[in-house]
Each structure stands twice: as structure tokens, then as C-alpha cells.
Amino acid sequence: MTSLDQLNHFLESNPDLEILELLVPDMNGIIRGKRLDVSEAKSLFSKGINFPAATHLLDSSGNVIDGIVLGTDDGDPDVTAKPVDNSLSPIPWLDKPAAQVMITMFDENAEPYANESRNILRNVIKKFEAEDLRATVAVELEFYLIQDKDALSINPRHGPVPGTILQDEGPQVYSMEDLRELDPFFNQLKETCKAQNIPMGTTISEFSRGQFETNLHHVDDPLLAADHAILLRRAVRETAKSFDMGATFMAKPFMETAGSGMHIHISLKNETGDLMFELDTNQGSGFNQNVEHAVGGLAQTMEEGMAIFCPNANSYRRFQPGFFAPITPNWGPNHRNLSIRIPLSDPKNVRIEHRAAGADANPYLVMACVLAGIHQGLVNKVNPPKMISEGEVIDPEITLPVKWDKSLDAFESGSILKQYLGSDYSDLFLRSRRCEMDRFNAQISNKDFEWYLRSI
């Protein structure tokens, strides 16, 4: 079915449609876009639409990065944008009948636009296809709900003590009461995800008040899995607004509570459909060499990947003791204090869980780096670090760059990930992050006044 056929079929089922929103995830994983009248939809689906190429290169505040091509210095040129196949879906939260579609860009030679993070991931996937390997992946995302409009500060949602105006205390991890109180919200979110083809799975109350985790069902297409993650974040935020709440995927929105992560679960099959990751009692780790080499590659590339996994200033506030945040590239089975975990599973479903990224990261770039690490490990037979046993008590030394400037230095000096992401895109990413870091550090916050104004 062509893109135009998909549109016509959708319009037949939704004859009252008035609005079409075009979604463009930028370098930060922030959705930018345009809104069209439905009368313009057929032109979009048949010919495409002009779109500024620099949209993909904005910083987190929507600023154009100084001194790069495809920005203000060269007139902000357009490229052609076209719909992503099978991404057209209804929007239930707007007042008028509306739909959304993801779009992807093409350069003047009709080639996929090189600075689009979806295409960066697509290029890494091609390396697996060249080895006749297929990845099955799923994404878990943690987030906070916010609900206290009368407060002078931003606070996570607290569950009430039933029958009183008092607020419940403690993290209440796995609380069924929290889920019960938010039943209308989660029911609406589930319906929205179903309508938008987002395979939402299990939801739990997480390790802090107002924090929740939702997982996505696994799919055999890493690009589609990243699409699902991007769209889930949008669905959560928009559904929360409908219930007079806010939602945030910031990595560390509150100082004394847990940070929010993005966990990537991945398994591999070869050209005959056989599982690549298996148990092996002949190996000291209990896992076969494919698992060990994949873990070895992930550990080897984690230091230079931290700039991708933790892309902004707030990302690095997540690295505090006691909150399951990664500080060294360790690994082992069934252990949440590790950066690379082998979850408990039956022998036919062995998978690797990558736990380094924050919930604020760009899913396409995170997925690209995770796949790159696994590919690097398998192709070069990289040995993993010493395995941490299940239940082992650890006090790891911080070896990963858990400061923003240090992570950017590690990415710049790294030699592996740039080969997968492309040197040009890597340079643009670095310039974007350094420019945003400089702008952030130049701000005068209230904390400056609270700490220094009176005493200095």
C-alpha cells in the first residue's frame, strides 16, 4: 500500500478529519513539526512538503546552533519531507478531529537526509543486515506526573491518604493504590496508545512518589521501537494534560527522588531465525560467547556513548548513590545495580538490558549506540569485564564520565561510535551539545542569589 493509499484509507474511516499534525523528532528527541489543514494532506502524501533542514539540529530550547551549516548563517534552507509509512494515526486530545503523521526528510538528491537521527539509526541497522542479523528490541521509560498548580515550586504528584487531605509518604514502589487512583489516566493512555499503534505494555508505580514506568512490547524493527518510544512520550504528556496534570521525562526532575531512565532490551537472531544469545554452562559466565562479546562491545563503547545517553545538563543529576543509576560499565544477571543487566528469563528468551540512558535521551541515537556497541563486540570478539554475580553486593568506583563536559570530551576523543554515527553527524552533535552547555552555564539561577547574594 502506497502512502497515498494509506491516507485515502484513513480518510474513509475518518471523514470528519480537519487537522493533520506533522511530527519531526529533532537531535534531542524533541518533537517539532507543522500543523496542516486536511485539504493539504493529499499533496503531502503524494509530493511531500518543504521543511527547514535545521529542524533536526536545534538545541533543547529550540535555538539554532551558532556557526553551523543549515542554519541562520546560510539562509536556513529547506529539504523535502515525506510521511513515514504506517505512522498516520488519530489524535484524541484535540478539540477538533485531528491526526498525526511522522515525517522523514530527503536531500536534494532524494537521498535520506544525513542529519536526521532516524536515518542515523537506519544506517546502523544496515550493518546488522549485512551480517544477516536481526535485532528484537523493546524500550522501557520512566516518568513523573506533576500535579500541584497552587504550589510555588514544581512537585511530583503525591497520592492522598484516603478520607483525608493528607499526602501519603514514602516511595510506595509497586503501589497498587497509586495505579488505582490514576485509573482514568492510565485507561485513557492505554486507549490513546491503541489508537496510535503504540504497543504499551506493563505499567508500575516506581521508586519515588509520582514516578511510573511503562514498557513497550518488543518488535523486530529497532527503528519502529524508537518511533514507539518517541510517540509514547508525547502520548503520556498530552494525556496528563487532559487530567490537569503535567508529565516529565527529565532524567532528574527532583533532587531527593529517583531519576528516570530509558532501558533498552535487545535480543538477536541470525539468518535462519536461531537465537544468538543463549545460556551456556560451559562458559564461566553461564552465557554463550555471543552474549559475552555483545556485552564486551557495550562496555567498551559506554564511556564515549554517555554524551548520547545523557544529552543535557539535567541528565547528570541522575548519578547519585542508591538510585540504580549507572556509574561504571559493569554487567551480570538479574542485578539492577548494573549498567548492563541480563534479566531473568527462560533459556529461549535470553536478552540484554542496557540501563545507561536517561528517559530524556533521543531514542534513535540511544538505539543506534546500543546496536553499535553490540555490533562492535560481536565483530571484534570483545571480551566483557568481570561479571557481577546475582545478589552480589557491590560498591563500584565511578569510571564513567558523569559530568556533562567530561562526557562530551569522551565522545570527542572516542574512536568507535563515530564510525557508526558518521563523523559529520558526530561533529554536529558535539557542537550542538557544547553550545547548549555554554548557554546553560551562562545563566544566573535563583540558587546563585540564595547562596551568594547576602554573604558575598
Protein language model annotation of sequence segments:
Residues 101-107, 212-219, 266, 354:
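Short, hydrophobic beta-strand segments
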Residues 1-202, 224-228, 396-456:
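ATP/Mg2+-dependent ligation/transfer catalytic cores
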